[in-house]
């Protein structure tokens, strides 16, 4: 467990590197990898079709590839990357948490949430998190390692397969939104997260053919990475986990604020908004008697007034053994009114999955 305020930007050394998987590779790299096995390069397109369009990673399902070639190609590009340990459901089975065991025994989780008009999937980008926010169960557990691009992508592929096969009831049969809000700080695993976004949004069969506009990437405020992300040309939404409008409190709640303060983080966010044309989501966990005062809502509204922004207030999810708890209803209402008084759009998030430790901030608490 990290010390209070301690930050980990680089994953610990010594972790066994995940094996190479087709989802780690660009279309050109897939052709090279297939050719290296002695097979014709066009097999790469067939494999991509099976994985990204049919969600099939079992060679037995690759019926358009000769049986003698399947094992060789599977060994080269479809290693046993991760396996489902268990699924846990709630909300009449429309919310499902998946506990994954990675190739090295590391555990991560994803959450699939099906609504009448949309389907959202919350995915992990790291095993653990090095940002050490004191109210977040994942942050308190520390960082084990970064996930590979394929380990990130496979969470979504499995979710899309589950929807297609009717494993999660109700609502549309295709993912609408993907949020990088599970375990980890996405921008601390920059290259692999960017690679995952490309696989998710490349047209089928090179990728999953999802819309960039349906993807949200969260960050606690790694300013250099935010500025770099602004230059990628993505149309994803950027969500900034702010949690306090003043540096004095944010230094405590979000320790990375001691590196890049509120003003620097917001300036980087506005640059992303300008370059992407997307409004910024400000994530703010309301914590009783800590950051939920109406005057802080007023200060937040003043900071954000006139900007391309939306404030997403999050009732704090209870974590076993934590001193932190959710705001009183009357304090939440006063905070909302204080922000809205400045013309800033603000809503309170519908939190799902609390009973299965699946909501934001709880993904590591039950397994560590």
Swiss-Prot record:
It catalyses: adenosine(2503) in 23S rRNA + 2 reduced [2Fe-2S]-[ferredoxin] + 2 S-adenosyl-L-methionine = 2-methyladenosine(2503) in 23S rRNA + 5'-deoxyadenosine + L-methionine + 2 oxidized [2Fe-2S]-[ferredoxin] + S-adenosyl-L-homocysteine; adenosine(37) in tRNA + 2 reduced [2Fe-2S]-[ferredoxin] + 2 S-adenosyl-L-methionine = 2-methyladenosine(37) in tRNA + 5'-deoxyadenosine + L-methionine + 2 oxidized [2Fe-2S]-[ferredoxin] + S-adenosyl-L-homocysteine. It is an enzyme of class 2 (transferase). One of its GO terms (molecular function) is tRNA (adenine(37)-C2)-methyltransferase activity. The keyword Chaperone does not apply. [4Fe-4S] cluster binds at residues 129, 133, 136. The keyword Coiled coil does not apply. GO terms for biological process: rRNA base methylation; tRNA methylation. It is found in: Cytoplasm. SUPFAM superfamilies: Radical SAM enzymes. One of its GO terms (cellular component) is cytoplasm. Gene3D superfamilies: 1.10.150.530, Aldolase class I. Residues 115-355 form the Radical SAM core domain. S-adenosyl-L-methionine binds at residues 184-185, 218, 241-243, 317. Its cofactor is [4Fe-4S] cluster. Keywords: 4Fe-4S, Cytoplasm, Disulfide bond, Iron, Iron-sulfur, Metal-binding, Methyltransferase, rRNA processing, S-adenosyl-L-methionine, Transferase, tRNA processing. Reaction proceeds by a ping-pong mechanism involving intermediate methylation of a conserved cysteine residue. This is Probable dual-specificity RNA methyltransferase RlmN. The lineage of its organism: Bacteria, Bacillati, Actinomycetota, Actinomycetes, Kitasatosporales.
């Amino acid at each position: 467990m990290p010390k209070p305020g301690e930050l980990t930007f680089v994953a610990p050394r010594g972790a066994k590197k995940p094996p190479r998987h087709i989802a780690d590779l660009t279309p050109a790299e897939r052709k090279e990898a297939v050719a290296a096995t002695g097979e014709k390069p066009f097999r790469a397109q067939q494999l991509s079709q099976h994985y990204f369009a049919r969600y099939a990673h079992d060679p037995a399902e690759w019926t358009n590839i000769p049986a003698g070639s399947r094992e060789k190609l599977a060994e080269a590009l479809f290693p046993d990357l991760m396996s489902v340990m268990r699924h846990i459901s709630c909300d009449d089975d429309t919310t499902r948490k998946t506990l994954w065991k990675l190739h090295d025994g590391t555990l991560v989780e994803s959450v699939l949430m099906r609504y009448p008009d949309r389907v959202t999937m919350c995915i992990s980008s790291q095993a653990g998190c090095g940002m050490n926010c004191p109210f977040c169960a994942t942050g308190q557990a520390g960082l084990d390692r970064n996930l590979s691009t394929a380990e990130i992508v496979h969470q979504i592929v499995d979710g899309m397969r589950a929807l297609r096969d009717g494993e999660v009831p109700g609502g549309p049969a295709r993912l609408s939104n993907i949020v990088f809000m599970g375990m980890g700080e996405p921008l601390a695993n920059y290259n692999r997260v960017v690679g995952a976004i490309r696989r998710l949004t490349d047209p089928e069969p090179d990728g999953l053919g999802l819309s960039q506009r349906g993807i949200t990437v969260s960050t606690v405020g790694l300013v250099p990475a935010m500025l770099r992300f602004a230059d990628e040309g993505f149309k994803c939404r950027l969500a900034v986990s702010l949690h306090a409008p003043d540096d004095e409190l944010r230094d405590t709640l979000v320790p990375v604020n001691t590196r890049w303060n509120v003003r620097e983080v917001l300036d980087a966010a506005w640059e992303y908004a300008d370059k992407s044309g997307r409004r910024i989501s400000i994530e703010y966990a309301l914590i009783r008697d800590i950051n939920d005062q109406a005057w802080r809502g007023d200060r937040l509204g003043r900071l954000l007034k006139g900007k391309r922004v939306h404030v997403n207030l999050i009732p704090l999810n209870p974590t076993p053994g934590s001193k932190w708890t959710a705001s009183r209803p009357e304090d939440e209402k006063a905070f909302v009114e204080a922000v809205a008084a400045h013309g800033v759009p603000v809503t309170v998030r519908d939190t799902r999955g609390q009973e299965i430790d699946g909501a934001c901030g709880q993904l590591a608490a039950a397994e560590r």
